From Swiss-Prot:
<dbReference type="InterPro" id="IPR008972">
    <property type="entry name" value="Cupredoxin"/>
</dbReference>
<dbReference type="InterPro" id="IPR033138">
    <property type="entry name" value="Cu_oxidase_CS"/>
</dbReference>
<dbReference type="Pfam" id="PF00394">
    <property type="entry name" value="Cu-oxidase"/>
</dbReference>
<keyword id="KW-0964">Secreted</keyword>
<feature type="binding site">
    <location>
        <position position="373"/>
    </location>
    <ligand>
        <name>Cu cation 3</name>
    </ligand>
</feature>
<keyword id="KW-0479">Metal-binding</keyword>
<dbReference type="InterPro" id="IPR011707">
    <property type="entry name" value="Cu-oxidase-like_N"/>
</dbReference>
<dbReference type="GO" id="GO:0016491">
    <property type="term" value="F:oxidoreductase activity"/>
</dbReference>
<feature type="domain" description="Plastocyanin-like 3">
    <location>
        <begin position="318"/>
        <end position="451"/>
    </location>
</feature>
<dbReference type="InterPro" id="IPR011706">
    <property type="entry name" value="Cu-oxidase_C"/>
</dbReference>
<feature type="binding site">
    <location>
        <position position="67"/>
    </location>
    <ligand>
        <name>Cu cation 2</name>
    </ligand>
</feature>
<comment type="function">
    <text>Lignin degradation and detoxification of lignin-derived products.</text>
</comment>
<keyword id="KW-0560">Oxidoreductase</keyword>
<feature type="binding site">
    <location>
        <position position="441"/>
    </location>
    <ligand>
        <name>Cu cation 4</name>
    </ligand>
</feature>
<feature type="binding site">
    <location>
        <position position="432"/>
    </location>
    <ligand>
        <name>Cu cation 2</name>
    </ligand>
</feature>
<feature type="binding site">
    <location>
        <position position="69"/>
    </location>
    <ligand>
        <name>Cu cation 3</name>
    </ligand>
</feature>
<dbReference type="InterPro" id="IPR034285">
    <property type="entry name" value="CuRO_2_LCC"/>
</dbReference>
Length: 467
């Protein structure tokens, strides 16, 4: 187990910016104090203040990432974390000749003044194998990614090794990381330049929200090509899915939860003409929910309230194991599902060591990348339509399921995960589309202390930011 102390300071006083720092996919054993989400495990770092994060690495190995965790700050405040094998060990596959981090993100027109039209290249030699560490840091979209003329072999997801899978393209959700091997196996004398391309995947009608569906590209160029032959135009990935290609997107348990994921509305005070939030249908406010509960951030962080035993009035320990208003048989339009929701700061409390199964049921018209802090989980099942608790568990993969910290749940579909609650503390679970986090598509798991000192949460650091 490695422990690192890293000081984060907010010196942007002129912009009155507040900062929070989350290491996405780092489990932080017994140490929720340094996890980072705003008003869940700490209060914000105010301008000109600082806070020392204690980063604890345990079993993670591979590619993770870090980002701000307050509103939309992570649109630009993010970066890669690469955790190499321990000394004396190596990858569970042939060592690549080179490693290349690739960060996929979104371009926000409101934040930039000039756009430079330039292509950035990376050179490679024929016969070499390259490990591409792909990270989707975007706020709103799953991304397709491919390299023309080459296959990709997925060897790790969210810093956990997986059974190698060779594909023409990958689909990566916001918040996810994937390590993929690229073999530079084109024949000598063929084209020496190939496009590396990324394209967003959306399920909403394109005319619903103005959207630039352009494809981001970079150029992979072989450096050992005969100099006598001038380089031709790069080849484009022919198998990169279209922007709305939905087909391409597509034990023992102590605690079972069925969680409906939905985008809905909150009643709004339409008599207040200055209320800018009342922009939804019939003057309602846009919201999002888990099990018909739209999470409301408290005035003080949940972790402090739990630690001091003062949770009363801050949160309620009655997050439902099943939807409050169940909706059966979701279809493409999901007509008839409950559209109004209610606010609440409801959390789920579990005993240390509990094996938890969560089935996410997507009722909305878009995908949702669901992320759990403090844990990695097994993705044991997926399916389209309504989850059938009698039939569908028989289809679970309990032999070699992927081990991840973010799972993408397609629209009108379900995904089942399992994890052991062996990390005491307060842990945020949320959709990684930031607008949905702000709207309330989140909740909190509180894992109680175990009986031994090694199974108990670490003491509160003395320099935690004040609310």
């Amino acid at each position: 187990m490695d422990r690192k102390g890293i000081v984060l300071g907010s010196k942007l006083a002129v912009f009155s910016m507040i900062l929070l720092w989350h290491r996405h996919g780092v489990d932080q054993p017994r140490n929720p104090w340094s996890d980072g989400p705003e008003f869940i495990t700490q209060c914000p770092i105010r301008p000109c203040g600082n806070f020392t994060y204690q980063v604890i690495l345990f079993e993670e190995e591979g590619t993770l990432w870090w980002h701000a965790h307050s509103d939309f700050d992570r649109a630009t405040v993010h970066g890669a974390i690469v955790i190499h094998p321990k000394h004396g060990t190596t990858f569970p596959f042939n060592k690549p000749d080179k490693e290349i981090p690739i960060i996929l993100s979104e371009w926000w027109n409101d934040d930039v003044e000039n756009v430079l039209d330039e292509a950035k290249r990376t050179g490679g030699d024929q016969g070499n194998t390259y490990l591409l560490r792909v990270i989707n840091t975007g706020l709103t979209n799953d991304m397709f990614f491919a390299v023309a003329g080459h296959c990709l072999t997925v060897v790790s997801i969210d810093a956990r090794y997986t059974k190698p899978l060779t594909v023409d393209y990958i689909m990566i959700a916001p918040g996810q990381t994937m390590d993929v091997l690229l073999e530079a196996n084109r024949t000598l004398g063929s084209n020496s330049r190939y496009y590396m391309a990324a394209r967003a995947f959306i399920t909403l009608p394109v005319d619903t929200i103005p959207f630039n569906n352009s494809t981001a590209t970079a150029i992979v160029e072989y450096t050992d090509s005969p100099t006598a032959r001038p380089p031709g135009p790069p080849e484009f990935p022919l198998l990169l899915p279209a922007i709305k290609d939905e087909d391409a997107a597509m034990a023992f348990v102590d605690e079972r939860m069925l969680i409906d994921i939905d985008v809905n509305f909150l009643p709004c005070d339409t008599t207040n003409a200055t209320n800018k939030l009342c922009k939804g249908p019939q003057g309602n406010q846009f919201a999002a929910s888990l099990n018909n509960v739209s999470f409301e951030s408290p005035a003080i962080d949940v972790l402090d309230a739990y630690y001091y035993g003062s949770g009363r009035g801050v949160y309620e320990e009655d997050f439902p194991n099943k939807p409050v208003n169940a909706f059966v048989n979701p279809t493409g339009d999901n007509g008839g599902r409950p559209l109004l929701t209610k606010r609440g700061t409801k959390v789920k409390v579990v005993e240390y060591g509990t094996v938890v199964e969560v089935v996410f049921q997507d009722l909305s018209s878009e995908n949702h990348p669901m992320h759990l802090h403090g844990f990695a989980f097994y993705v044991v099942g997926r399916g389209s339509g309504t989850f059938d608790e009698r039939r569908d568990p028989a289809t679970y993969n309990l032999v070699d399921p992927p081990f991840q910290n973010t799972v993408s749940v397609p629209k009108s579909s379900w995904a089942a995960i399992r994890f052991r609650a062996d990390n005491p503390g307060v842990w945020f679970m949320h959709c990684h589309f930031d607008r949905h986090v702000v709207w309330g598509m989140d909740t909190v798991f509180i894992v109680k202390d175990g009986k031994t000192p090694q199974a108990q949460m670490l003491p509160r650091p003395p320099n935690m930011p004040e609310c």
